[in-house]
Curated annotation (Swiss-Prot):
InterPro entries (UniProt xref): Ribosome_recyc_fac (IPR002661), Ribosome_recyc_fac_dom (IPR023584), RRF_sf (IPR036191)
Compartments (UniProt record): Cytoplasm
Pfam families linked: RRF
Stretch forming the signal peptide: none
Protein name (database record): Ribosome-recycling factor
Disulfide bonds: none
Coiled coil, from the record: none
Single GO cellular component term: cytosol
Primary site of residence: cytoplasm
Length: 186
């Protein structure tokens, strides 16, 4: 077998698509407090833009409440402004160096919109996985054409690629179902 075909690399790239999906799903608001909801918020701090988690500690003291402990007292206003301007529909309450953010419940229409976004993310992940599969199968076909592998090896490796694809698509589907359940939970 040629060094050009690497099943481990194909699996790693497919797992990368799943990791991206899980990160994207983690950012979807579900009505339940999660630090991942505001982690991507960037704050203007010390003359540059920094992620929120580099200027404050984010915690979840209650199921529908986030607490942001700002390390530098002078940064409280900038953190408050960054969270308000992040288009997340959140309004922090400032208490000294701590910002408390109540997570409002989602209405039915917003839940359905979130579910559609989750479906789109999942479909994007499936497409990425299929692209990786196609790349792997193209390499196998080229190796077969160049007579570097036998037909039997090509079929066996193609079957392994398909099995990895099926497993990764099943992982995407289970992540989507779990997120949908979380979104639709009242």
């Amino acid at each position: 077998m040629s060094a050009e075909f690497d099943l481990a690399d194909i699996k790693r790239r497919m797992q990368g698509a799943i990791a991206t999906l899980k990160h994207e799903l983690g950012g979807l608001r579900t009505g339940r407090a999660s630090a991942s909801l505001i982690e991507p918020v960037n704050v203007e701090a010390y003359g540059q833009t920094m992620p929120l988690n580099q200027v404050a500690t984010i915690s979840v003291p209650e199921p529908r409440m986030l607490s942001v402990q700002v390390w530098d007292k002078g940064m409280v206003g900038a953190v408050d402004k960054a969270i308000r301007n992040a288009n997340l529909g959140l309004s922090p309450t400032v208490e000294g160096q701590v910002l408390r953010i109540r997570i409002p419940e989602l209405n039915e229409q917003r839940r359905k919109e979130m579910a559609k976004v989750a479906h789109k993310y999942a479909e994007d992940a499936r497409v990425a996985i299929r692209h990786v599969r196609r790349d792997g199968i193209d390499v196998l076909k080229r190796l077969l054409k160049d007579k570097e592998i036998s037909e039997d090896d090509e079929k066996r490796h193609e079957s392994e690629v398909q099995k990895a694809t099926d497993q990764c698509v099943a992982d995407v589907d289970s992540a989507l179902v779990a997120k949908e359940r979380e979104i639709m939970q009242v």
